Amino acid sequence: MNKVLYALLTLAAFTSCANSFNIQGTSNVSSLDGRKLYLKTAQGDSLVNLDSCDVVHGQFAFHGTIDSVEVAQVFMDDVNLQFPVVIEKGDITVRLDNTQQRVSGTPLNEKLNDFWTKFTQLRNQYAEIDHEESAAILNGHDEETVNAQLIKKALGVYAKGDKLFTKFVTENFDNILGPWCFMTRITYDTTPNAYPVWMNDYMYANAINQLPSWVEYIMTKATDSFKQNPQVKAFYADFLQAQKEMNGTAEPAAEAVPAAGTTPDAVAAPPTPAQMAGDSISR
């Protein structure tokens, strides 16, 4: 009996080790020192703490075990630091700075870091366009003419984002990053007042108009495992219902588009272009 019990305990310990994650973090943001950080993931419409820690002299760490690979976010109290991390077994390294954020150490986190860096660069371009508009108006240029020219520039940034999302989702259909990126774009594109005021109405309408065809394109290309992801499956069912309602072929049902910040795994809407001019994780 003792031998059987010992064997079971050994197996349990081995399994726990095999599914454990270890996140070592550093930060040079002075306002984070002494603060408590939380690693949170979404379960349904709720956020669940995976672990928490204090930042001490710019150092922090998260540890735990997982049943399956998922995407989590780092919070300072209730403030989402807009820093996604893939929770998978292995040693993960994160760096939180005002100017740069990086996650590395495991295969999926390397992929995520590459995508998030490019996505952040595109978001910054909206802020740059906003600054360009303000400078032009201050210099006496006609506001309507300036805005018309810069809207075209903003649409070019949106087109680059469309290609970035499409490429990343299709390259990651069969791991957690595909569904996560798919739902992240939906959350981002359906967030009202996401752009600087002078371009918001036009850019938001453009995003909403483009989204249905993008969703259909992704779903026609998607693998079975992607389609069976619970979040994707639930969203797409609501999306199809909403499309039928718009065409007058179905009774009204739940809205297809989730509210910003409620999308599973995305956890919260990414920082919007309207926030980027002074955006920093120290706020």
What are these regions (language model features)?
Residues C17-G156, D162:
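A non-transmembrane, solvent-exposed segment enriched in polar/low-complexity residues
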Residues A154-T170, D174:
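Extended amphipathic alpha-helical interaction segments
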Residues L8, A13, F115, A260-G261, ...:
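A detector of low-complexity, intrinsically disordered, Ser/Thr/Gly/Pro/Ala-rich segments
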Residues T170-F173, L177-R283:
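Charged, long alpha-helical assembly modules
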Residues M1-V29, S282:
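Bacterial Sec-dependent N-terminal signal peptides
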